[in-house]
Design a protein with these regions (language model features):
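Phosphate/adenylate-binding glycine loop and adjacent helical scaffold
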Residues: 1-173
């Protein structure tokens, strides 16, 4: 939708593919160097906007405001929310790990590691370290997720990948 495109970083065009006969295959690819995971959705799921590849079934895609802190210090200003029943396809940097959180169980991870989580889990961005680290280090905020819920995280970090490439880039003159 246009709303998802303007706010979620997705393409302004949503492609719809309809099989003309049984047994057809559709190939999907993401823009990140890593796995694509199929997540069965039966209610609501929250996904990083850059990780969303597509969906099937009766899923509705909408944007979900992350909040000021998450938008300023996080990797995306918006996350996407899927509502309904169907399969959601997500892409990640590296591999994708699925973690089931029990009620009250807590997981803390770097903002760049989150791919998706079920809406049954509570999440918030919290500061880790000093204010100086937060303002100048860029990696001082983490996501705290509290179960119950399902969390999908990626094994690689785009910011670490970008930092690793810097020594190989041509120098400005």
């Amino acid at each position: 939708s246009l709303k998802a495109a303007a706010l979620g970083g997705e393409s302004f065009f949503v492609n719809e593919f309809i099989a003309q006969e049984d047994g057809c295959t559709l190939g999907l690819t993401g823009n990140m160097l890593g796995d694509i995971e199929v997540i069965p959705v039966t209610d609501e799921f929250i996904v990083q906007s850059g990780a969303f590849v597509g969906s099937s079934g009766d899923l509705t895609l909408d944007t979900k405001w992350q909040g000021f802190t998450k938008g300023i210090f996080g990797s995306n200003l918006f996350m996407l929310k899927t509502v309904g029943t169907g399969d959601m396809f997500v892409n990640a940097w590296g591999g994708i790990i699925k973690k089931e959180l029990q009620s009250g169980e807590k997981m803390i991870l770097d903002n760049y590691q989150l791919v998706a989580l079920s809406a049954t889990a509570d999440y918030r961005v919290t500061k880790h370290g000093s204010l100086k680290t937060t303002l100048f280090g860029g990696d001082a905020l983490v996501i705290e997720i509290i179960g119950p819920g399902t969390v999908y995280l990626q094994t690689k970090n785009i910011m670490e990948f970008a930092r690793a490439l810097i020594p190989f880039l041509p120098q400005r003159r």
